[in-house]
């Protein structure tokens, strides 16, 4: 599941306010970057690009998308289906900065609860029984979650567990292996996931403590 916000562009008797360039969009929040296009393309108005993926290196764990919906004459912001509190704080700061520029409104923000969205996203992934693993694109690398990981994220401290899990997996020195550690009754289960010839492999080891 994905949550989308719209911020209508300002309208006047002279017509629609000039659409921001992708570069100007990134300048709304200090440190915000995008590597969706070469720098020369970022000078174009946002509506000439399909979308840009944004993040703050060193803070963000996941990317969020920004685009321009011509039909609605509005800026569109898509949340990733899984994100951390810091990711949400960055996105919210971006929404507020864009709102200050347009002077209109943020459609979809009223009644939005970040933690409820997180829980609903986890439930949606767990409902996909055909998938053994959930793969989310992190800021640099894909991040893998087993069903056991996802179930643990529904516990009382599930969001904190999710954030710790993401930080741990991002510290892996290579893209080739992604360990997932699960503690249960003195037993540590380590799933080592790796990519080889475009195929996904998994090895499960048990360490008794």
Q: Can you name each region flagged by the protein language model?
A:
Residues 1-2, 49, 99-102:
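A short, compositionally biased
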Residues 24-86:
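Short, intrinsically disordered low-complexity segments
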Residues 118-209:
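Aromatic/basic-lined ligand-recognition segments
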Residues 13-16, 62-64, 82-90, 200:
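Short, surface-exposed beta-strand/loop "edge" segments at domain boundaries and coil↔beta transitions
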């Amino acid at each position: 599941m994905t949550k989308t916000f719209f911020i209508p562009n300002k309208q006047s008797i002279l017509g629609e306010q000039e659409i921001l360039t992708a570069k100007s969009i990134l300048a709304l929040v200090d440190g915000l970057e995008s590597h969706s296009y070469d720098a020369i393309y970022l000078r174009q108005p946002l509506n000439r690009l399909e979308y840009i993926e944004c993040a703050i290196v060193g803070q963000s764990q996941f990317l969020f998308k920004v685009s321009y919906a011509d039909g609605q004459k509005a800026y569109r912001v898509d949340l990733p289906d899984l994100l951390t509190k810091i990711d949400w704080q960055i996105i919210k700061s971006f929404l507020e900065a864009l709102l200050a520029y347009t002077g209109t409104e943020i459609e979809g923000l009223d009644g939005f609860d970040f933690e409820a969205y997180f829980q609903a996203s986890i439930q949606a992934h767990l409902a996909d029984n055909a998938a053994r693993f959930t793969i989310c694109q992190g800021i640099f690398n894909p991040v893998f979650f087993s069903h056991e990981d996802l179930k643990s994220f529904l516990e009382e401290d599930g969001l904190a567990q999710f954030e710790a899990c993401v930080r741990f997996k991002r510290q892996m020195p290579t893209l080739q292996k992604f360990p997932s550690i699960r503690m249960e009754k003195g037993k540590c289960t380590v799933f080592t996931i790796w990519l080889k010839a475009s195929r996904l492999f998994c090895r499960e080891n048990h360490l008794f403590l």
